[in-house]
Amino acid sequence: MIGVVLVLASLLSVGGQLCQKQATRPLTTGGRRRHLMLWLGLALICMGAAMVLWLLVLQTLPVGIAYPMLSLNFVWVTLAAWKIWHEQVPPRHWLGVALIISGIIILGSAA
């Protein structure tokens, strides 16, 4: 169960980061202030919820195990940027993602 909470905390944290990125995207039409406030508001909600879930995780897991699991954020952000904004991801970056996933698997099996 705590693994699900940890993944959800990670996804909400990433959601907050992606909302911040979206807030900075240029608009083709007016409404810049509304656009900015919407995405920054969503970012705050996501980040706040992530923090609450993170506190639940820290009550259960040792910080030495829990904190490295947040490396998943790098994986989620890379995948989202690639799919949502069609950002180029070089092979070296994909190798880093694979290494992060390997590290998470190794650390997760020790928990």
Curated annotation (Swiss-Prot):
The keyword Lipid metabolism applies. It is a multi-pass membrane protein. Signal peptide: none annotated. GO terms for molecular function: carbohydrate derivative transmembrane transporter activity. Coiled coil: none annotated. The chain crosses the membrane at residues 38-58, 61-81, 91-111. It holds the Pfam family EamA. Residues 40-109 form the EamA domain. It is found in: Cell inner membrane. The keyword Magnesium does not apply. Pathway: Bacterial outer membrane biogenesis; lipopolysaccharide biosynthesis. Keywords: Cell inner membrane, Cell membrane, Lipid A biosynthesis, Lipid biosynthesis, Lipid metabolism, Lipopolysaccharide biosynthesis, Membrane, Transmembrane, Transmembrane helix, Transport. Its main location: membrane. One of its GO terms (cellular component) is plasma membrane. GO terms for biological process: lipid A biosynthetic process; lipopolysaccharide biosynthetic process. Translocates 4-amino-4-deoxy-L-arabinose-phosphoundecaprenol (alpha-L-Ara4N-phosphoundecaprenol) from the cytoplasmic to the periplasmic side of the inner membrane. Heterodimer of ArnE and ArnF. Belongs to the ArnE family. This is Probable 4-amino-4-deoxy-L-arabinose-phosphoundecaprenol flippase subunit ArnE. It comes from Salmonella paratyphi B (strain ATCC BAA-1250 / SPB7). The lineage of its organism: Bacteria, Pseudomonadati, Pseudomonadota, Gammaproteobacteria, Enterobacterales.
